[in-house]
């Protein structure tokens, strides 16, 4: 695929570098809407410039205005009278590349500290508490060149939130006691990443360039860089934070985006009032004209040992910064071709040889002044032995592009696809939208900020050739990641401990690559037949319903249909669940269902890639009840793709070579689960404990050896022999078209796979284990990879119902911010601290998830201590404060989906849970508004208090790698810290030694009754 953003290579990294999503200039008039509103400066000295002509999509109903304040802050204002949440973001064009050389992670630490009190609002959790009380949330991230802060809040409270937010940039406190505690949060954040291959590889790439270049810095920081070493060197880190903020948090390096219901004039006045006081220190914008990879860092090979059993090949070329060429985007053009996955592509040829499974190619962001061009593949066992040949094929393909020369029709196709994507893009969620825009305001003229990432304008063959000229063997860096290098390395990266070996690539290999000839197997892509041409929005039908309607109900299928009446874009979402009792009957069948669908997707890839480029994608996966298929995107060519998928499902022939390769990759993924985070392990074990039927990773691994090609071939017709299909077709389609689509699916399966309906008795769902009153069970396991503990504590409350849902959700709303403030900010238990509802199989409860270096039984005691403080807190709460929580939860629940796929996912959740409560939000919020403080206290005392008569508790304790053992419960005297609230004395829990025995001894809950009477639902 074409490489889109820096984080595709490093999915865990918070590095939202400049996007390369396409490119960018005012589009043809037909595709653009211009702002009508104008606003004069009214001689306001705080405003230097106003941009009233922001180019936007004609489908975009929001109004925009750009500002440049006199102090240099760039601003984009968005007025959306329909928004439920308001949002704002501020991006400082400074990041970890500007850290002082002796205090790694200072910019990241500064980001953490700004949340913890300002002169105007000194209370440590004032900002987060205000947001929590008004249905809001906030976050921030630090990357090499950016620190980006953002929040959302109920639309009535934008001004109060923005006032608290603006103080971050005017007068933060950097309180000494907060600093001493928050350094632990940064350290815990780093510790979470230490055994993560994406972070390790990213740091190793930085470490193997020029050590004097800022790119080589360690950006996250940890306790050693932010406390221990500065203390040894006599450096006062609080003074350094003040100095850093004072030096770099200058208005000329800031960009702000604000979205609200207010008019553009009101938003203008608000931003001017709050942000024109930020001081302009005229800080020069950091630029990095020298590339971190110089002559001595090229023609090098790095052999790297990963944590997980993965095999990857990374081929990297240094290239100049292409940002200024955004109107022609030569990197996009080359990424489109090198990363193509259709017939005749580089991936197609490498896959046919059995060497690779996936390929990503394209430009990757560096910083102002430098970029990279990458070609990354994941290797098969065979591919690991043919790295030299794989890279030769890459250079053969690059040679093909040189020989053919830049093709204007390819550029035109990219331009058309991007123009369609821009015109019909989904409405964004406010928080993500403001954060993204604040980040890109630094790079484009105000008028082009919405179009720049999409619209291409100039075909520049000279620039394409310039970039192509950089993709030569003498410029290459190669990294191979494989467990096979264990014990054969001689170097260790400083911060993550990654083992690697560096070798110069021999001259004869470079020469061989330089002499790469043309390979007849390579072809440029053909014209894309999936580009939509019909964008007609169908008129609403007379019998259109506000919620999905059941328009077909037979032994073979249930079809739910909803014509879109909100978004009016030429898109649809088609969701299908194929129920089969064979899919999960035992671990062997579960493995076979998984492999069947992985092989099917693998064989469809060349065909479906063109559809994906044209905005039409599909998802296919095995589930505990059968198979799930969704097709999303432009409705014009949707039935063509769907028909192809169903035909392929019903007539699939397995390729033996691909079977072996994909089975081996599956075995590695099962083995790699051991390296997941401790808190993820805790969640996994709890699911195994609470669900009636769930196969473990070990059971699946054991059964995988029994999956042979003949066995899998025999399984597919068995799986398809009897099915029940439940579907939701939602979007720009008619009822008649929906019935036709469903008929096509059924007819195809009947014709090719002779599918018959399941019996109704075969459609029963799995149920949840019912814990006894006053029961407390503990299950312990160790994580062999990470040196942190993880815990999930689950208080099972009851079956889902309108009343039970609202008791639980309101309690979670009330404790959410205090939980984070107490357990993470004050007690510093760890970076990951979460509380909220857990729901599965119609049963629910309250859960706490924590990852920490502290032992699980200590975490357990702190959660119990916290719950006791919450009882008093709720009892002492004023009626006004209680009503604020009800209002905040109501706003969250009634927050409208922003796009078709989000609304569809909501309805689909009701269908697959078989609850069918499509109007859930309105009915539950109506009930919520009747609740009193006494109701919540009663709920707490009955279900959650230590001595509650209906308390049902399970705790999963995941021990850190180096912990030999740990008691399940312990006493922790408070005298070591007078600020800690008293933990209650806990009874001895029942330790679960064997999951099966545990489940065998307990009853199961019944299933929740459907909300719909099916006889009445039929139209």
Swiss-Prot record:
Consequence when changing residue 817 to C: Increases catalytic rate towards INS and amyloid
Consequence of substituting residue 767 to A: Decreases dimerization. No effect on degradation of ANP. Retains the ability to degrade an aberrant form of ANP, when in the presence of both ANP and the aberrant ANP
Reported effect, residue 111 to Q: Loss of catalytic activity
Activity-regulation annotation: Activated by small peptides. Activated by ATP and GTP, and to a lesser extent by CTP, TTP and PPPi. Inhibited by bacitracin. In vitro modification of Cys residues impairs enzyme activity.
Result of changing residue 530 to A: Strongly increased enzyme activity
Enzyme Commission number: 3.4.24.56
Known function: Plays a role in the cellular breakdown of insulin, APP peptides, IAPP peptides, natriuretic peptides, glucagon, bradykinin, kallidin, and other peptides, and thereby plays a role in intercellular peptide signaling. Substrate binding induces important conformation changes, making it possible to bind and degrade larger substrates, such as insulin. Contributes to the regulation of peptide hormone signaling cascades and regulation of blood glucose homeostasis via its role in the degradation of insulin, glucagon and IAPP. (Microbial infection) The membrane-associated isoform acts as an entry receptor for varicella-zoster virus (VZV).
Protein's recorded name: Insulin-degrading enzyme
UniProt source species: Homo sapiens (Human)
């Amino acid at each position: 695929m074409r490489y889109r953003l820096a984080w595709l290579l490093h999915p865990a990294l918070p590095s939202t570098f400049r996007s390369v999503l396409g490119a960018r200039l005012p589009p043809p008039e037909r595709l653009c809407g211009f702002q009508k509103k104008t606003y004069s400066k009214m001689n306001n000295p705080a405003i230097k410039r106003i941009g009233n002509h922001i180019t936007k999509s004609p489908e975009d109903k929001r109004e925009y205005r750009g500002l440049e304040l006199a102090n240099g802050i760039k601003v984009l204002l968005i007025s959306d009278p329909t928004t439920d949440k308001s949002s704002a973001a501020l991006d400082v064009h400074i990041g970890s590349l500007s850290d002082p050389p002796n205090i790694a992670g200072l910019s990241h630490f500064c980001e953490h500290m700004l949340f913890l009190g300002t002169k105007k609002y000194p209370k440590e959790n004032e900002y987060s508490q205000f947001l929590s009380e008004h249905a809001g949330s906030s976050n921030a991230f630090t990357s090499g060149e950016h620190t980006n802060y953002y929040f959302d809040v109920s639309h009535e409270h934008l001004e109060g939130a923005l006032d608290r937010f603006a103080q971050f940039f005017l007068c933060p406190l950097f309180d000494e006691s907060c600093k001493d505690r928050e350094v632990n949060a940064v350290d815990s954040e780093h510790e979470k990443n230490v055994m993560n291959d994406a972070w390790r590889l990213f740091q190793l790439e930085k470490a193997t360039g020029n050590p004097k270049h800022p790119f080589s810095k360690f950006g996250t920081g940890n306790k050693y860089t932010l406390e221990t070493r500065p203390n040894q060197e006599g450096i006062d880190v609080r003074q350094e934070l003040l100095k850093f903020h004072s030096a770099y948090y200058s208005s000329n390096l800031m960009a702000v985006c604000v979205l609200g219901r207010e008019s553009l004039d009101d938003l203008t006045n608000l931003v001017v009032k709050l942000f024109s006081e930020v001081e302009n220190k005229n800080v020069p914008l950091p630029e990095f004209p020298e590339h971190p990879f110089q002559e001595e860092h090229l023609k090098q090979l790095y052999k790297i040992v990963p944590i997980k059993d993965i095999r990857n090949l990374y081929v990297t070329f240094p290239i100049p910064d292409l940002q200024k060429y955004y109107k022609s985007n030569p990197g996009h053009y080359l990424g489109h071709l090198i990363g193509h996955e259709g017939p005749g592509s580089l991936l197609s040829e490498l896959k046919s040889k059995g060497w690779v499974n996936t390929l990503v190619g394209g430009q990757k962001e560096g910083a102002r002044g430098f970029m990279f061009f990458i070609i990354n593949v994941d290797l098969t066992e065979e591919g690991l032995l043919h790295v030299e040949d794989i890279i030769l094929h890459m250079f053969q393909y690059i040679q093909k592009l040189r020989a053919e020369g830049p093709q204007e029709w390819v550029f035109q196709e990219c331009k058309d696809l991007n123009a369609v994507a821009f015109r019909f893009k989904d409405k964004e969620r406010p928080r993500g939208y403001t954060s993204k825009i604040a980040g890109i305001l630094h790079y484009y003229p105000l008028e082009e900020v919405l179009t720049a990432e999409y619209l291409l304008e100039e075909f520049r063959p000279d620039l394409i050739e310039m970039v192509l000229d950089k993709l030569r063997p003498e410029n290459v860096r190669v990294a191979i990641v494989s467990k096979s290098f264990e014990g054969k390395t001689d170097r260790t990266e400083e911060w993550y401990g990654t083992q690697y070996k560096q070798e110069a690539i021999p001259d004869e290999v470079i020469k061989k690559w330089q002499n790469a000839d043309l390979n007849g197997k390579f072809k440029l892509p053909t014209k894309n037949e999936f580009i939509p041409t019909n964008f007609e929005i169908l008129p609403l039908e007379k019998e259109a319903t506000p919620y999905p309607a059941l328009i077909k109900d037979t032994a073979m299928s249930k079809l739910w249909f909803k014509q879109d009446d909100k978004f009016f874009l030429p898109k649809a979402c088609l969701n299908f669940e194929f129920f089969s009792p064979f899919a999960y009957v035992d671990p062997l069948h579960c493995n076979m269902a998984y492999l069947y669908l992985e092989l099917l997707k693998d064989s469809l890839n060349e065909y479906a890639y063109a559809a994906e480029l044209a905005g039409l994608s599909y998802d296919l996966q095995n589930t505990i009840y059968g198979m799930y298929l969704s097709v999303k995107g432009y409705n014009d060519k949707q039935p063509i793709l769907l028909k192809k998928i169903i035909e392929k499902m019903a007539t699939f022939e397995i390729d033996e070579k691909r079977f072996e390769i994909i089975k081996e990759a599956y075995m590695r993924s099962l083995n790699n689960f051991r390296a997941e985070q401790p808190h993820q392990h805790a969640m996994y074990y709890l699911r195994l404990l609470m669900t009636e039927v769930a196969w473990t990773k070990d059971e699946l691994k054991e059964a995988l050896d029994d999956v042979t090609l003949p066995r899998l071939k025999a399984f597919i017709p068995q799986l398809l022999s009897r099915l029940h299909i439940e579907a939701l077709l939602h979007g720009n389609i008619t009822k008649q078209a929906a019935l036709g689509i469903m008929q096509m699916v059924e007819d195809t399966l009947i014709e090719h796979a002779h599918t018959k309906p399941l019996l109704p008795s075969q459609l029963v769902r799995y149920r949840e284990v019912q814990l006894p009153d006053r029961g407390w069970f503990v299950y312990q396991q160790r994580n062999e990879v990470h040196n942190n503990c993880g815990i999930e504590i689950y208080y099972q409350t009851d079956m889902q119902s309108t009343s039970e849902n609202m008791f639980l959700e309101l309690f979670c709303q009330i404790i959410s911010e205090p939980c984070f403030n107490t357990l993470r900010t004050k007690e510093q238990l760890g970076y990951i601290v979460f509380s909220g509802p857990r729901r599965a199989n119609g049963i629910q409860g309250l859960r706490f998830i924590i990852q920490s270096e502290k032992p699980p039984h200590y975490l357990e005691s702190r959660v119990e201590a916290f719950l006791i403080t919450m009882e008093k807190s709720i009892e002492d709460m004023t009626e006004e404060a209680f009503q604020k929580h009800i209002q905040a939860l109501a706003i969250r629940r009634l927050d409208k989906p922003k796009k078709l796929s989000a609304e569809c996912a909501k309805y689909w959740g009701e269908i697959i849970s078989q609850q069918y409560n499509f109007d859930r939000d309105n009915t539950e919020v109506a009930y919520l508004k009747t609740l009193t403080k006494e109701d919540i206290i009663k709920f707490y005392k009955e279900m959650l208090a230590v001595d509650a008569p209906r308390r049902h508790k399970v705790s999963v304790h995941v021990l850190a790698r180096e912990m030999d053992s740990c008691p399940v419960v312990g006493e922790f005297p408070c005298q070591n810290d007078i600020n800690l609230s008293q933990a209650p004395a806990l009874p001895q829990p029942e330790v679960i030694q064997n999951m099966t025995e545990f489940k065998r001894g307990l009853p199961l809950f019944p299933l929740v009754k459907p909300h719909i009477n099916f006889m009445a639902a039929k139209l």
